[in-house]
Amino acid sequence: ARESTRLTCAAVTGPQTTLDPAQMKEWTPNSSYGGHAFGFKTFAEFLAGRESILPLIAEYSPYALVSADDPAVYMTFGGPPAIGQNQKDPTHTANFGAKLAEHCATKGVSAELHYRGLANPKHATPTDFLLAKLKAAK
C-alpha cells in the first residue's frame, strides 16, 4: 500500500508567518527580527534591502506559499493580536497569526487562531486540534 506524505494538518506555537520585512513593519511597527536569515545585520538594512530578496521571500515565506489545497493550521500565541501596534514580543506576536489566518481565508484554507485569554476557543490546545483533525482523517 502506498501512503501520502502530505500533511493532514499543522499546529504551531508562536509562528513567524512572514519573511517580508514590509509586512512585519505594517503588522507590528516595532518588528526587529529576521534580517539575519538573509545576511542583514539590522532590521533597517533588512527593510531597505527587501527588493533584492523578494524572490527568496516568495520561495520561503509561509504567507507567500499559502494555496487553496493547504491543510488546516492551528496557531497559538501568548496574547491577542493588535495589528499596527507595537508589541511586547514582536517576534512571536499574534499579529503574525491573525494576518496569516486572514490570508488563508481568502484561499479557502482553514486557519485557527488561538491566544491566551480567547473566550470559547474551538480547540483549547494544539493537541486538541491535532487529535480532532487526525481522528476525522481516518
Where are these predicted regions, by residue range?
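Primarily recognizes the serine-hydrolase "nucleophile elbow" in alpha/beta-hydrolase
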Residues: 1-28
